[in-house]
Amino acid sequence: MRLFIILSVASFGAIGVLSQGGGGGGAAGGLLEGGGGFEEYGHRSRGSIIGLSRGIEIGRHYGGGGGGGGEGEEGREHELRGGGLELGGGGGGGGGGGGGGGEGRHYEIGFGGSHFNTPVDVHHEEAIHLKAHPEYHSDYHVADHKTKDFKSKHEVRDGYKVKGTYSLLEPDHKTVRVVDYVSDKKRGFIARVSYRKHH
């Protein structure tokens, strides 16, 4: 039976999968609760760490020794520190039957990203140039009896042709100037000016 534990760090957007071979619930419970590590009592299994995201540094460190009827619990640690996850296993000698230090394995996952040259997918999209038909209609009017400011403007654009008219009260306050104009690509700007009495 294989046990997969997904390690996820949301702030870095990286995910790693820890695969553990071998045995039963003792190893799984121990790994998640602080004991057990990567080996069950009396059985050695091989662990591997698979990086699934860009920028994960994976290191594996082994200790020496072996033997003993069981493994010591000291030295097993799981902690998240400084942008990486460190899983430690191993420890002192077993309780009976043999002397040497237990096998110590040390797994480390960091999120540096500076050592990897992973390809970056670059998608070049073809630009779509749409030519919209320019069209608008605008007009405004001002009639201020206190300052004697009277003016108006009306303009319509259809494609590249613009036509409109504007009028304003002359400084003598008796005459209104009216300008009718047309503008297009062929003829340019053509204006016709006329005057009428203000009433």
UniProtKB/Swiss-Prot annotation:
- What's this protein's name? Adult-specific cuticular protein ACP-22
- Pfam families listed in its UniProt record: Chitin_bind_4 (PF00379)
The UniProt entry, under InterPro entries, shows: Insect_cuticle, Insect_Cuticle_Struc_Prot
**Highest taxon in the source lineage:** Eukaryota
A single Gene Ontology MF term assigned here is: structural constituent of cuticle
Q: Where is this region: Disordered?
A: 63-103
Q: In which tissues is it expressed?
A: Epidermal regions synthesizing hard cuticle.
Question: Which residue ranges does the record assign to the Chitin-binding type R&R domain?
Answer: 133-199
Q: Which GO terms describe its cellular component?
A: extracellular matrix; extracellular space
* Keywords annotated in UniProt: Cuticle, Signal
Which cysteines form disulfides? none
Protein's job = Cuticular proteins play a significant role in determining the physical properties of cuticles.
The stated induction of this gene product is:
By 20-hydroxyecdysone.
User: Which residues, if any, are the signal sequence?
Assistant: 1-19
